[in-house]
Amino acid sequence: MSEGITDIEESQIQTNYDKVVYKFDDMELDENLLRGVFGYGFEEPSAIQQRAIMPIIEGHDVLAQAQSGTGKTGTFSIAALQRIDTSVKAPQALMLAPTRELALQIQKVVMALAFHMDIKVHACIGGTSFVEDAEGLRDAQIVVGTPGRVFDNIQRRRFRTDKIKMFILDEADEMLSSGFKEQIYQIFTLLPPTTQVVLLSATMPNDVLEVTTKFMRNPVRILVKKDELTLEGIKQFYVNVEEEEYKYECLTDLYDSISVTQAVIFCNTRRKVEELTTKLRNDKFTVSAIYSDLPQQERDTIMKEFRSGSSRILISTDLLARGIDVQQVSLVINYDLPANKENYIHRIGRGGRFGRKGVAINFVTNEDVGAMRELEKFYSTQIEELPSDIATLLN
């Protein structure tokens, strides 16, 4: 039985692990996995990734409390991919989610991260035929699914569990409150006794604590509080630039019509940051550029210069979107819409923290319109078309 688990208050667990790894490069990940991580758009690990990836890779049972939008899926997906033996063509990691939509979303993330690896991922969910399951389960190394369908397949002997070494429960609180408790318990009993258990949950009700007591061995406990970011006080606009090639012209036109002390411009790739920096410098703008490959010392110098006002424009990848406060910035420009929806609030929150007002302008191509509508839905917000009197908004 896991020591001390039953004494934890329902609202929050106590962290008992304090190791933090700040860079993916320092996690000793498989080279092809690392390529997938950077290719997916992750640059620097989020708070939960800095704390939970390593203990999972090391084989500890892990109980992590974190809200959605903190990088949980990336956490257990990266750790699971690192632990998979690619030479074994049988299920080695089982990931459970409360809904088929979430299971499909997880499968998509795992497959993207495993793009350069020889790993097969099967989604075991309702709405597909058992024949498809039988095919997919034969040689998939990672299975993502909903409890009912997974249990059904194990019972029908389509899903061999003898090689399973990791059992991951995402959104455990939701899963247990949705009446899956019995099935989850039954699945547990059908896995090898040495299976590592990883449980992620936003809250810690008794149902979840009971599972940890029954099935986890001295788990590493990690609590990550979500950044209290809000879009309040930030005016959000978009400019339809139609095609990618018109973005630069639009940016310089914008700068001709407004007077801004400082701005942060976000691009999705290092290459784009470098290209934009060169163009703006050629047009006599004072620009700094920052991305994750830069040595820490150089990054610190660039940030210092920007804070002191000696450069007016800071161009960055999503590295800056978390954890670096630039309080004096009143304008954020998303030259590219973020690849991950969660990064939107981290990017534009720059100008709006500490009660300061801010303006965010999104450059949107015809292809981006759908993604922008998704952002509006995700954050229950509205992004208006940029008005012609933009200058008055920034003064």
UniProtKB/Swiss-Prot annotation:
Keywords: Acetylation, ATP-binding, Cytoplasm, Helicase, Hydrolase, Initiation factor, Nucleotide-binding, Phosphoprotein, Protein biosynthesis, RNA-binding. Its EC number is 3.6.4.13. InterPro entries: DEAD/DEAH_box_helicase_dom, EIF4A_DEADc, Helicase_ATP-bd, Helicase_C-like, P-loop_NTPase, RNA-helicase_DEAD-box_CS, RNA_helicase_DEAD_Q_motif. It comes from the Eukaryota. The modification N-acetylserine is found at S2. GO terms for biological process: cytoplasmic translational initiation; positive regulation of formation of translation preinitiation complex; regulation of translational initiation; translational initiation. Component of the eIF4F complex, which composition varies with external and internal environmental conditions. It is composed of at least eIF4A (TIF1/TIF2), eIF4E (TIF45) and eIF4G (TIF4631 or TIF4632). Interacts with eIF4G1/TIF4631 and eIF4G2/TIF4632. This is ATP-dependent RNA helicase eIF4A. It comes from Saccharomyces cerevisiae (strain ATCC 204508 / S288c) (Baker's yeast).
